[in-house]
Amino acid sequence: MLGYWNKSVYITYFGAFIACFGFMLSFALNNIDYSFAGMIIAAVCDMFDGKVARHLKRSENEKSFGVEIDSLADIVCFIALPALTLYHFGMTNYYQIAILSLYVVCGIIRLAYFNVAMSDKDKAISYYQGLPVPMSILIFSLVWILNKKINFDISLVYTIVVPIVGLLHISKIKIKKYTDTWFYILVCLLAVVGIFLLFLL
């Protein structure tokens, strides 16, 4: 088969599969919760694939493939799918479509920039420059969960939040990157709680 196969890319493949599966299931069942749940799982996978990759002995081709497949998966899971999900479930006015398009452009600019600037994913970093694209899913999901509890004008809130998140993707703000084990455990627990809240509220 084409491609490269190791533990790190298995995680990337699984995340992309789950995100796409949840997205299509949300359309089939007309329930946005499945799309957000799939993208949350993909975000957790994205958090771990680089960590696993740094502990593997890989050829230069495998390293390059890992960088490219991770970037392509990010485009699908955290840029295209969120925009299409929010469009399908309410952001359909012309200015909202423009906002979603802006979000997509900001996301691909960010990923292309870091593909050039940081082509070696084995290199550990202490901070992020700008908001990483997987974090957008956590923000969008949190807004949706709060809407279930408070019941505000969700379309209006996303109209404000989406462009802010998009611009944060290409901003130069520095966000500390936590790498200790307890942080990863906490993020996984929060992801599980978030998915449960999506379906319970």
Question: What are the functions of these language-model segments?
Answer:
Residues 124-201:
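C-terminal membrane-associated helical module and adjoining short loops/tails
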Residues 2-12, 29, 33, 64-67, ...:
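Membrane-water interface of alpha-helical transmembrane segments
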Residues 7, 11-17, 38-41, 76-79, ...:
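Lipid-exposed faces of alpha-helical membrane segments in multi-pass integral membrane proteins
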Residues 51-59, 108-123, 167-177:
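C-terminal ends of transmembrane helices
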Residues 21-37, 76, 80-101, 142-157, ...:
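Helix-coil boundary and interhelical linker segments in multi-pass alpha-helical membrane proteins
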Residues 9-13, 55-111:
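Multi-pass membrane catalytic core of lipid/isoprenoid biosynthesis enzymes
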Residues 1-50, 166-201:
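Topogenic membrane-insertion module of multi-pass membrane proteins
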